[in-house]
Amino acid sequence: MRKYRFTFLFIVLVQLIGYTQEKDIEIELLKKLDSISRSNSIARHFASLYFETTVLSINFFANADPAVKNFIERLENNFAGFFFRSADANFNKTGIPVVWQSYFRDSTLSPLQYKLLGINAHINGDIWQALTSEFSAEELMKNRMTYLRFQKGLQKQYQRFYDEYVSSNLKTGLVNNTTLGLSRIYGKIMLSRWRKRQLRLAILYHTDKIKFEDALSNLNRKREELNRLILRNL
């Protein structure tokens, strides 16, 4: 897996150098994720998965029109900042954002638990914040289909991730075998629902603060319930 990651880093960096200086942002993003993934920090577990997903996103939108690429690049850069700041807070022993506290609280979890906790924190805790701090309601509604378009790419990444951890983890393997593979399908559906919910939440943030607060409270409760399931059952 590490060789796979370095190979893609080399390919992507070479491709990006040939484009405009705006691509420097993506180069720096990949370099920082790769650096964290090679560190001794427990942040490395999610960073390695995040690196692969970012490469996938860059390649997925490589031939998109400038407006689409601009939206995705702005989102990627702002979104990643939430993970980086949480990792830095853990390293510096300062206050870790609430959505990442379950991830960094225990240094003895399995790589699978860290990756699942990271996915839960980043998707169910960070996306709406990245969307609202970077885009207006009008921009979000205008770029709704661009945001949702990447779901196809994420499903490929989920498939790869699922195949890897099911083959190496007895409990998740048993779950898959006893449900005839439905847990694989269910995971893809939930990933899509989570991302759509984050977009709706971001639009509510700009348009209806009362409904937003109710939806956010419900989301926070579900996120913490999922964290407990990950910690207790895997």
Model-flagged regions — what are they?
Residues D24-S37, L56-N59, V99-R105:
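Short, charged/polar, low-complexity loop and linker segments
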Residues K69-N70, T108, E139-K188, R195:
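Extended, low-complexity, amphipathic alpha-helical coiled-coil/linker regions that act as scaffolds
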Residues L33-S37, S57-D65, S86, N90, ...:
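Secondary-structure edge/capping motif, primarily at the C-terminal ends of alpha-helices
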Residues V98-F161:
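Active-site-proximal alpha-helical scaffolds that flank and shape metal-associated catalytic sites
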Residues K69-N77, S86-G95, S107, K115:
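N-terminal amphipathic/basic membrane-interacting segments and domains
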Residues S37-S86:
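N-terminal interaction modules that seed assembly of large macromolecular complexes
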Residues D24-E28, L182-L234:
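A cross-kingdom marker for long, charged
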Residues M1-E22:
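Bacterial Sec-dependent N-terminal signal peptides
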